[in-house]
Amino acid sequence: SKDWVGKKVIMDFGGTVFVGVATMVGLHRSGGTHGNIKVTGYSSTFLLESDHTCASWCNKSLSDIVKELTDKAGVQALVNPETKSKLEYECQYEETNFRFIQRLARQYQEWLYYDGQNLVFGKPQAGSTTKLTYGEELSVLDVCSQTLARPIKGSSYHSVNDQTYNGQSPDTAAGQNTLGQAAFDSSLALFTAPAIQRAEPRITNKGELDAYFQRKQQSDSAASNFITGESDCRILKVGSIIDVHTAIHTGIGIHVKNSIGTYIITEITHVAGMGDSYQNYFTALPSSIPTLPCPDVP
């Protein structure tokens, strides 16, 4: 088993495949003469966990930069960001390659996740939808709303043309379902004074600044409505679109199934046991949201 360290690992849950890298192997013994081999690893994005490094790019697009890094590391990636324009200048400073990609996703409010086989940068095309019904595939279901939306405004100075641009959030929900819209409106009713912030990316005109504050507010409030659940459906993964139904008891032996909406899975934990035992725990956001919550990076 010593030769397993650093090798590719393919895990098949009978419907979902996860590709990763074994980073640690150990022998575990307890209470007898027998023992177990314990393998620890990460997704293939571990190959982007270089030591802290520095680099810079001029007049390159986000796609160009991310593809360059993933290609060098040998990481399969689906790169299609909404930000298409070339960037005047972008710098990686004392960061791992993965942390730098996370920061780019945060700066430009782009989608970023690992679907089990590919690093996805940019909102993916909608795939097939899986129907999940509470009481059938779903054993636990929680539907939640929270007050996340805040008004924001700020400015950005462009030194080349000596211009200061001012902008603010539109304070309108985009892509939220009924529950998310209600939570968004309630939050803005609570927080009426705009926070003053600076734009993280380089801004060259007022249109870019307005778009930045719009997408930042969308990202900050993306989880205004979310669900968590437990299921035995083996085909689920991060990025899966699910149509969630719940059955309402209307009489003796009578149940009416209603859809509470379509969601995209953003977190999932797979638990596979002995034999055919399997269960997963997931969190999902409305599938129509334009951006994900920001990665927690500086």
Feature locations, PLM:
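Amphipathic alpha-helical and helix-coil boundary elements used as assembly
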Residues: S1-P298
